[in-house]
Amino acid sequence: MHQKNILTAGVELKESGKALIMIHGRGSTAKNILSISSYLNVDGYTLIAPQATNNTWYPYTFLEPPAHNEPWLSSAIALIGELVSELAKTIDKKNIYILGFSQGACLTLEFVTRNAERYGGCIAFTGGLIGDKIYTDN
């Protein structure tokens, strides 16, 4: 499953008071998603980018039933949850932003749907909720 392999950039969390978790897409890397920060208004943020095992968060398309993407999907959601929990020890969740691109956007949306709280924001570049239908239990 996914290991806690994290790249960081930007300002130290104790100084910034706000963090952006950046989740890459299938076939990409944490380093690559961090590179788009130069196009975003994130001066003064702590940037955190987890790396997916084998550059993919889950094996199949996001339109498959979630069970088809297990156990990888649950592992990815747990990793994002662990990052949010660690950040929340230092900063308020309303200062935690989560951004994803493609497969990372799907994971971002799935995480915030399953863990609904007052985050600073959720940014999804080209993604949707995971599954062949809306799973209201999530």
What residue spans do the PLM features occupy?
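Serine-hydrolase catalytic machinery in alpha/beta-hydrolase-like enzymes
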Residues: 2-91
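The feature captures the conserved acid-bearing segment of alpha/beta-hydrolase catalytic domains
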Residues: 11-12, 129-138
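Structural motif
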Residues: 18-19, 95-97, 121
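Active-site signature of alpha/beta-hydrolase-fold catalytic machinery across serine-
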Residues: 35, 110-114
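Alpha/beta-hydrolase-fold catalytic nucleophile elbow
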Residues: 51, 99, 123-126
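Gly/Ala-rich beta-loop-alpha elbow adjacent to hydrolase catalytic centers
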Residues: 99-104, 108
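Hydrolases whose catalytic domains are alpha/beta-hydrolase-1, hotdog thioesterase
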Residues: 107-111, 133
